Amino acid sequence: MGSDINYVDDNESSFCSLWSRIHKKIDCVELFSNPNLGDDYFFNRLNISNRCNYVDDILNLIKHNYAFNLNTYYIHSICDNENFVMSNKRKFGTMNILSLDVNEYVMHMGKHIEVDFVDKNDLNEWIEVFCRSFDSVKIRDEVTTIISNQFKKITLLLANYYPNQEKYPAGCCLLYEKNEIIGLYCLGTTQQFRRKGIARELISKAVQIAKSKGYNSMIVQTLIEERYEDFYKKLGFKPIYKKMLHTLYLK
C-alpha cells in the first residue's frame, strides 16, 4: 500500500506543480509557490517527504529565502510518517485522500443538469464558474493563464443547469492523469445552484471518463474541516490515507 500512496501523492504533487510559479526541491521538502493565487492552502504548500531529519533548518531556510511575497506556506505531511513531528507549528487541518471504485459506482441522473467537455473556445466559461465556486474572482487572471497554458494536460468538465429551459453554468471540475492514476480536482458549484445534485452529476461524468480510459479507481482530496467528507463517502469514496496540514508563517 505504501507504493500506492506514493503514486497517488505524486499525482497530487504533479497537479499542484501546474499551478506553481516556483516549484523546487530543497532537500526533503518540495516547495510549490504562486503569490498570484493568494493564501491558498492547496497550492502554496511545502510537501515533507518521509525521512526529513533537519526539517526545522530547512523550513527556516525557506522562510528567509523563498517567501516570494507570500504570508504563509502550508506544510503537508502524510500522517503515517513516523519520522516527522511538527509540534512547533500551528495545525491548519487534516486532509483526507479518498478513492472510488469506478466499477461499483452507482450513476446519478440529476434533473435539468448537463455536463459537457470544455474545449479551448469555452475556457472563459469554465474559469468564470471556477472563480465563482471557490470565491476566487480576484485571481481570475492568474487562473486564466494557468488553465490556458496547461489545457492539454487536463480534462475540463462544465455542468450547466436548466431549471426553465434557460442555461446557467453552475459547476465545474477537472481530471488529471499521472502514474496510471486519475485524480478529480477543482470540483465546485456556484453558490446559487448548490444542493441541486450538480456535484454528483459532475462526479458521474468523471466516472464515465475514468472507466472509458481503463481506470478502476479515481482519487479526490478533501479537507475534513470543510465537512465534505460525508458527501464523498455516501457516493462510495473510501479513505486511503490522511495528511496533516500545518502553517509556516513567513512574516
PLM features per residue range, with description:
Residues 1-12, 45-52, 95, 102-141, ...:
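Short amphipathic alpha-helix that is part of the acyltransferase structural core
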Residues 50-113, 246-248:
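Acyl-donor-binding surface of acyltransferase catalytic domains
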Residues 17-24, 68-71, 94, 148-158, ...:
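A short helix-loop-beta-strand connector motif used in the catalytic cores of GNAT acetyltransferases and
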Residues 54-62, 186-189, 195-208, 212, ...:
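Conserved acetyl-CoA-binding loop-helix of GNAT-fold acetyltransferases
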Residues 137-190:
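A conserved beta-strand-loop-helix scaffold within acyl/acetyltransferase catalytic domains
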